[in-house]
From Swiss-Prot:
Transmembrane segments: none
Keyword Ribosomal protein: yes
GO cellular component annotations of the record: cytoplasm; small ribosomal subunit
Gene name of this polypeptide: rpsP
Protein name: Small ribosomal subunit protein bS16
Biased composition regions of type Low complexity, renumbered to the chain: 114-124
Amino acid sequence: MALKIRLARGGSKKRPYYQIVVADARSPRDGRFLEKIGSWNPMLSKDDEKRIELNAERVSHWIAQGAQPTDRVLRFLDQAGLAKRPARSNPTKAVPGKKAQERAAEAKQKAEDAAAAAAESAAE
């Protein structure tokens, strides 16, 4: 049985509240789970201590049993110091595309031409 540590949504419309649960990966998001190990209330301010609550002992137990945390839960565990999130390395993501590079080169060329024309007219 593939176990996941994931979020199960509760609360009402426009007022989300999430339980951090251990569940079989095949069960529905808000369906059957094995154990509730914490909660997350995104409606509280970011510095509120009750925003994220985790039972560290049970989290460690389930990770030792082979449960895989989802991306969002892994962020919470990393903040709490219970698990390490791998560093993301995608250096090509910030590089502009071909068209953007061509437009930047054209704009640079126009600026150089304008500066040269201004210097030429000032010299006369």
